[in-house]
């Protein structure tokens, strides 16, 4: 089939950047957007200007009640109830569920009532099957109507863990992600439900937080189930995060051996997904980078032949958004 037609539910950070990634790559067509909290003129403004990734390099305007990007008209809906969005009328076959609210099969399934054929949840899901490009995307099949693209951190960790496990075997490992702030955090101290620390001022603190990212790797790489877990530190940077994977290896390996296999993977089967660098990089060097994960050869360290700390960078917004687009293109190739 030709390019798949896509609707986006929730025009937040990921919704807008999936839209940018779609136009940049040309792999899918965005035909509809739903957001009850943003009107059309505001959508134009929010899409055009971005404090993190800069101004959109193209044209964007409102015309005849539609959002027109690079001359392509996009139907706009403002429904709160996902079951009432007329995706079918707009020609949307797939829906990116990027509100962060409808992350279960049941809730995300509401989109199917409006004529969508498949739903891609741009967040981890409690019950939807999770797919990570380069890791288990080949396991996707046509019987699945609702899937999840997992989290940005799982997309960073899983490709690296796969390469290490395939070559040396991971006995067990702990992950820490030093993670940029996201929209769920507070600018100054405020109330935050059950997780009190999460309500502390994002600009003033390093905040320990939970993440299911490492455990989720066990869902996309079954052999690693129960072998990885981890946590996060939220730090006062706007974007770009870094994974620190400390793991025990089954087969002995020199650090140079590890560098070699990761570099090979980055130039071969995982090209465009897993990057490799020996440069003296810092986080801002990865702003707007499209890789899921970039291995930092110079930052890692080995204690001995069986125990290593591996470092990998990721643009938690844009790298992830590009994988959502890639996953949809992969699904479309299986129709």
Swiss-Prot record:
InterPro entries referenced in this protein's UniProt entry, alphabetically: GlycerAld/Erythrose_P_DH, GlycerAld_3-P_DH_AS, GlycerAld_3-P_DH_cat, GlycerAld_3-P_DH_NAD(P)-bd, Glyceraldehyde-3-P_DH_1, NAD(P)-bd_dom_sf
Site residues, Activates thiol group during catalysis: 179
Modification sites for Phosphoserine: 83, 122, 148, 151, 241, 312, 333
Keyword RNA-binding belongs to the record: no
One annotated GO biological process: glucose metabolic process
Pathway: Carbohydrate degradation; glycolysis; pyruvate from D-glyceraldehyde 3-phosphate: step 1/5
Activity modulation comment: Glyceraldehyde-3-phosphate dehydrogenase activity is inhibited by fumarate, via the formation of S-(2-succinyl)cysteine residues.
CDD domains to which the protein is assigned, alphabetical: GAPDH_I_C, GAPDH_I_N
PROSITE patterns membership: GAPDH
Binding, D-glyceraldehyde 3-phosphate: 151-153, 182, 211-212, 234
Positions carrying N6-acetyllysine: 61, 194, 219, 227, 254
Post-translational modification Cysteine persulfide, affected residues: 152
Consequence recorded when altering residue 246 to A: Does not affect glycosylation by C.rodentium protein NleB
Modified residues (N6-malonyllysine): 194, 215
Residues modified to Methionine sulfoxide: 46
A Pfam family assignment: Gp_dh_C
Residues that bear Deamidated asparagine: 9, 64, 70, 149, 155, 225, 316
Residues modified as Phosphothreonine: 75, 153, 177, 182, 184, 211, 229, 237
Subunit structure comment from the entry: Homotetramer. Interacts with TPPP; the interaction is direct. Interacts (when S-nitrosylated) with SIAH1; leading to nuclear translocation. Interacts with RILPL1/GOSPEL, leading to prevent the interaction between GAPDH and SIAH1 and prevent nuclear translocation. Interacts with CHP1; the interaction increases the binding of CHP1 with microtubules. Associates with microtubules. Interacts with EIF1AD, USP25, PRKCI and WARS1. Interacts with phosphorylated RPL13A; inhibited by oxidatively-modified low-densitity lipoprotein (LDL(ox)). Component of the GAIT complex.
Cited function: Has both glyceraldehyde-3-phosphate dehydrogenase and nitrosylase activities, thereby playing a role in glycolysis and nuclear functions, respectively. Glyceraldehyde-3-phosphate dehydrogenase is a key enzyme in glycolysis that catalyzes the first step of the pathway by converting D-glyceraldehyde 3-phosphate (G3P) into 3-phospho-D-glyceroyl phosphate. Modulates the organization and assembly of the cytoskeleton. Facilitates the CHP1-dependent microtubule and membrane associations through its ability to stimulate the binding of CHP1 to microtubules.
Record-stated family: Belongs to the glyceraldehyde-3-phosphate dehydrogenase family.
Entry note about domains: The [IL]-x-C-x-x-[DE] motif is a proposed target motif for cysteine S-nitrosylation mediated by the iNOS-S100A8/A9 transnitrosylase complex.
NCBIfam families cross-referenced by the UniProt entry: GAPDH-I
Descriptive protein name: Glyceraldehyde-3-phosphate dehydrogenase
Top-level taxonomy: Eukaryota, Metazoa, Chordata, Craniata, Vertebrata
Recorded name of the encoding gene: GAPDH
């Amino acid at each position: 089939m030709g390019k798949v037609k896509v609707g986006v539910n929730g025009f937040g950070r990921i919704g807008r950047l999936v839209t940018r990634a779609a136009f940049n790559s040309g792999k899918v067509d965005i035909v509809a957007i739903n957001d009850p909290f943003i009107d059309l003129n505001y959508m134009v403004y929010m899409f055009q200007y971005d404090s993190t990734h800069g101004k959109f390099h193209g044209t964007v305007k409102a015309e005849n009640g539609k959002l027109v990007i690079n001359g392509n008209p996009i139907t706009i809906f403002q429904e709160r109830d996902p079951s009432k969005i007329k995706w079918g009328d707009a020609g949307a076959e797939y829906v990116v569920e990027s509100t962060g609210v409808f992350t279960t099969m049941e809730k995300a399934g509401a989109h199917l009532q409006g004529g969508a054929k498949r739903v891609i949840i741009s967040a981890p899901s409690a019950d939807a099957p999770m797919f990570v490009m380069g890791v288990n995307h080949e396991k996707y099949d046509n019987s699945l109507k609702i899937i999840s693209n997992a989290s940005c951190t799982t997309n960073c960790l899983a490709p690296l863990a796969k390469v290490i496990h395939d070559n040396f075997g991971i006995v067990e490992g702990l992950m820490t992600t030093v993670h940029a702030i996201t929209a769920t955090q507070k600018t100054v101290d405020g109330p935050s439900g059950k997780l009190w620390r999460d309500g502390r001022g994002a600009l003033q603190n390093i905040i320990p937080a939970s993440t299911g990212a490492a455990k989720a790797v066990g869902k996309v790489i079954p052999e690693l189930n129960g072998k990885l877990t981890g946590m996060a530190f939220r730090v006062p940077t706007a974007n770009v995060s870094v994974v620190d994977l400390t793991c025990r290896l089954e087969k002995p390996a020199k650090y140079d051996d590890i560098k070699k296999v990761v570099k090979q993977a980055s130039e071969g089967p995982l090209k465009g997904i897993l990057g490799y660098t020996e440069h003296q990089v810092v986080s801002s060097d990865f702003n707007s980078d499209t890789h899921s994960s970039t291995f930092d050869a110079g930052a890692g360290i080995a204690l001995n032949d069986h125990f290593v700390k591996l470092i990998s960078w990721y643009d938690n917004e844009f790298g992830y958004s590009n994988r959502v687009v890639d996953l949809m293109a992969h699904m479309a190739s299986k129709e």
